[in-house]
Regions:
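PRPP-associated nucleotide enzymes
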Residues: 1-195
């Protein structure tokens, strides 16, 4: 549900007006990132990492692209995904999650795993993933591109590594709100690539 507030934001060399979309914090100013911005954040993250990781766990959907880039940069071959569903209603902060996808314990036990997501906003999903890794006997650390400290539900916890601190709603270049419309494109209707 879109908020009623319109926020004016400077985007690159152009000005843009965006309706707010975060139901938990409807008055956040939005910041739209470019791929160059993401590269800079990852370049800032990588030197922070302490030691090597046995694997990397990307939280869907936000962690897929930064996790893929980081796994390539660090040459991590053991790449896993976790998908966690929380009800999206504002009053559901205490709801229990549903794990839509999670690696089996045999891939986690006695390993050091880097958890990757795009942003630590309220922290629920990341903390529940880290808790499940700990229950499997896995040591883990958390890396995010952005850390929104003020909105975190966890006063005594946060990511081990982050590219930047923000108080804005971040729009990443892979999010559908900044991609060209694809509603007219249908799978299987395009030409096949030449061989």
């Amino acid at each position: 549900m879109l908020g009623q507030t319109i926020i004016y934001t400077q985007v690159g060399d152009q000005s843009a007006v965006f309706p707010t979309e975060d139901p938990l914090e409807p008055n956040l100013e939005r910041e739209v990132l470019s791929w160059t911005d993401v590269d800079k954040l990852i370049d800032h993250l990588i030197p922070q990492f302490r030691g090597e990781f046995d694997g990397l766990l990307m939280i869907t959907k936000g962690g897929l692209i930064p996790g893929g880039i980081i796994s390539e940069a660090l040459n991590i071959k053991h790449v896993l995904t976790a998908s966690v569903y929380f009800p999206s209603q504002v009053d559901s902060k205490l709801a229990w999650p549903t794990f839509m996808q999670f690696p089996p314990d045999t891939l986690l036990t006695n390993r050091r795993i880097l958890i990757v997501n795009d942003i630590w906003a309220i922290g629920r999903v990341i903390m529940i993933v880290q808790g499940r890794l700990a229950a499997a006997g896995c040591e883990s650390e958390i890396a995010v591109l952005h850390y929104r400290i003020k909105s975190s539900l966890f006063a005594d916890a946060g990511p081990d590594y982050y590219g930047a601190v923000t108080d804005r709603q971040i729009i990443y270049p892979w999010e559908s709100s900044v991609l060209p419309p694809r509603s007219r494109l249908k799978p299987g209707t395009g030409p096949l690539p030449a061989i």
